[in-house]
Amino acid sequence: MTRQRIAIDMDEVLADTLGAVVKAVNERADLNIKMESLNGKKLKHMIPEHEGLVMDILKEPGFFRNLDVMPHAQEVVKQLNEHYDIYIATAAMDVPTSFHDKYEWLLEYFPFLDPQHFVFCGRKNIILADYLIDDNPKQLEIFEGKSIMFTASHNVYEHRFERVSGWRDVKNYFNSIEK
């Protein structure tokens, strides 16, 4: 029997990209932005005067290589990998300098995944999978399979998609549909 495919976004789903950006912005611009102040907002809209700084941080060599892994992501993805074909679908077109760092990060933190299943793309409607776990509503709305929204500060008021709030929720979601 053919295994179903799950495509998983990297930034804000597997990796805490926003936390690293906020930390760097706070240090460099002498600000005190708190993660909870971002609920329902994007960082670039909160500090439009520092939008260039945010992009500079994202373009720095090594930035994406040093991100923290989201809690429980490794263990849950490893368990899912036993029953599903897992693909990592990360939008890398906006920051082309991120390719190498993202690839190395995935190899380090998810060594049990097949690197041939790492997809660096722009729009995720090109991904042929049964499920997409992503924090970006724009990606989820163009995906042709089942869209699952991973909670992030910028999408808390989005209600069009089934939602998971962390990797334990992801595990529970897929455990419930296997029965």
UniProtKB/Swiss-Prot annotation:
- Cofactor (UniProt): Mg(2+)
Q: Where is the active site?
A: 9 (nucleophile), 11 (proton donor)
Q: Where does Mg(2+) bind?
A: 9, 11, 135
Top-level division of the source organism's lineage: Bacteria
| UniProt EC number | 3.1.3.-
Q: Which UniProt keywords apply?
A: Hydrolase, Magnesium, Metal-binding
Q: Ribosomal protein as a keyword?
A: no
Q: Is this entry keyworded Hydrolase?
A: yes
- Write out the GO biological process terms: pyrimidine deoxyribonucleotide catabolic process
What is a single molecular function from GO for this protein? metal ion binding
SUPFAM superfamilies per UniProt = HAD-like (SSF56784)
* Family matches, as Gene3D superfamilies: Deoxyribonucleotidase, domain 2, HAD superfamily/HAD-like
Q: Name one Pfam family in it.
A: NT5C
* Record's function text: Dephosphorylates the 5' and 2'(3')-phosphates of deoxyribonucleotides.
Q: Which family does it belong to?
A: Belongs to the 5'(3')-deoxyribonucleotidase family.
Q: What is this protein called?
A: Putative 5'(3')-deoxyribonucleotidase
